[in-house]
Amino acid sequence: LAEAVFFWGKVMDANQAQSAGQFPESLDRKANFPPGTIELASAKMCTAQQPQAVITNYLNLLQKVLNGDTGIIHENEIGPVEGIDTLQSIGAQSHLSSLGKQALGSLAVIRLNGGLGSSMGMPTAKSLLPVRGTLTFNDLMIRQLECLRKETGHNVPLIHMTSFRTDEDINLVMQQAAYCNPEDLPVTFRQHQHLKIYLDDLSPAQESRDDLNWNPPGHGDIYAALLATGIAQKLIDAGKRWLFVANSDNLGATVAPEILGYMIHYRCPFLMETCRRTEADKKGGHLAKNKSNDRLILREVAQAPTIEGEVIPEFGNIGRYHQFNTNSIWLDLQSVVKIAALHDGCIPLPLIRNIKPVDTEDPSSRKVIQIETAMGAAIESFPGARALEVPRGRFMPVKHNSDLLLVRSDWFRENADGTISQHESTGGAPPPTISLDPRFFSMFGDFSSRVLHPPSLVHAKSLKVIGNWQFKEPVIIRGHVVLETQNQERGQTPDLVTQELVDKANRN
């Protein structure tokens, strides 16, 4: 605590100056943050046993908030990205795949497993959601790694980064699966936690329920967590140099030797897998080029300027900003250690300022600022970092139950190696657009009771479900289908979807 307070003495001087009615020029005069904000936040972080490097980094981000920094990346600061390589182009270079296969023994896989399935009505870790029959995301990840080891003879470890919300669940499940990593490497490590800040007076959150005072710091914490927990050093000691990091709910994120070979061949310290944006992606973050240093930069929607509460139209210009981050990245662990050593044990990352109710289950509760960072934003911290455009097959996230319906259907097939791929019967067509009535399908429990038998979607272009329906028997969706019923009450028995009704609802 003493070290943190001493390091941030200048900021505390600013608090003292404010109490005396004097504002330094560097601080926003409208902030009106209470005296002692930095000391109180530092003390709370220390009490929560957060590492010194994490506290220092958090206080740095907090100072930006107190100074009025919103983390916004303005249009005149960035430009479009051109001329990035594609997986298709490097896949034709057989020497890259061979190089990657030879280096698999020095690779480790890390899955981001800190999120709950709350958006789908699940109180547990999202990776415990059944996605194919009884198989969960976790089951599929384990199967993939075990098949990779058997096929290649290389002991590639699988390590989960958990959060204070998911750590117990994930460790229990991995123990039940009797999963162990080679070289006695740990199966999990836990990311840190950030203190919430009240929006109205910029003081640290002090709710009676202590868990409401904290938020996960965003997946940008992976760098600090790797270093502070000692995982980075353990991996290095075990001969691991390369990391493949991906979201636990991305079924398309698998080890690709040709990408690893590409990194090694070009001595790339950081590689981000990107996909080409479509109209459906225009509300999400995008890749750009920083005009000040010509480096790649990531702009998330929370960092986009707004006009009268609406994000500027340039943000959604998919012609200008045509690449988005899949959140699958490849890292040179030696470069991570080297760059972090230059910045007090952390990789410098831009501020993401998320405003939410202090109790997310009570929208009327007091608003707070959640101080977060994004893993992909580190692309601008690594000289020589690259982006690689990959096909949509490597980006198959399950964010909503509409995604889950598609994954459970025959549009996908489950392969022997634990991977999920588009079924050949689809002819390579883009996935159908699926819209499920949120009143009856948004929560996993409701979805499970209403989708007892997923419909066939191989020949579907779109499916829209309005009202209280139940899929209980096999039906085939062809073309564009809209199912609408007058049954709009949750307490009523759902209407049964039959093939006859589906054929009548066809809008081709």
Predicted regions and their residues:
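Residues immediately flanking
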Residues: 113-114, 248, 333, 401
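Extended hydrophobic secondary-structure segments that form protein cores and membrane-embedded regions
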Residues: 109-112, 157-164, 188-192, 243-246
